[in-house]
């Protein structure tokens, strides 16, 4: 069956997989299953940094997921959205709360070094786009909001 998507590309956004020992945020498929499906149906995979991290409770998870999708040729994009082990103004520990980077939210595991490492791995893995999605304090000015996004952009260290 052929579909005309008028240039749009279907992408699977990875969310945390179901792990019986922990309360899921989404509880969907594993990255390995999503990569297999994406390869089979010729669609891309988007890695949401925070969702990979909260799944494994480790900043290394996002990097590992980026590498895995890149090796299979299905890595389409990476969105930087933080996560962390502590309760913050954005929610409980390990919430899919789109925490800002560590420079703006110390409890976030999304440090400048992790952003750079993952951005570089994504580019090397054939990624088509990088993005950022984060919550901001409700009273943040426009300048503060833009500064938070700029911190992520600069941490990518794009050349």
Q: Could you describe each region identified by the protein language model?
A:
Residues 3-5, 49, 94:
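A residue-identity detector for tryptophan
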Residues 1-41, 145-151:
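Active-site acidic/histidine proton-transfer and metal-coordination neighborhood
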């Amino acid at each position: 069956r052929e579909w005309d998507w008028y240039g749009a590309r279907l992408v699977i956004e990875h969310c945390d997989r179901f792990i019986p020992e922990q309360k899921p945020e989404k509880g969907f498929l594993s990255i390995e299953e999503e990569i297999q499906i994406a390869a089979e149906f010729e669609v891309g995979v988007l890695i949401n940094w925070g969702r990979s991290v909260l799944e494994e409770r480790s900043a290394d998870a996002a990097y590992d997921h980026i590498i895995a999708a890149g090796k299979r040729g299905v890595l389409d994009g990476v969105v930087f959205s933080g996560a962390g082990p502590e309760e913050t103004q954005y929610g409980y520990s390990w919430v899919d709360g789109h925490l800002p980077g560590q420079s703006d939210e110390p409890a976030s595991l999304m440090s400048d070094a992790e952003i750079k490492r993952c951005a570089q791995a994504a580019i090397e893995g054939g990624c088509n786009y990088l993005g950022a999605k984060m919550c901001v304090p409700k009273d943040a000015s426009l300048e503060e909001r833009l500064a938070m996004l700029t911190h992520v952009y600069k941490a990518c260290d794009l050349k």
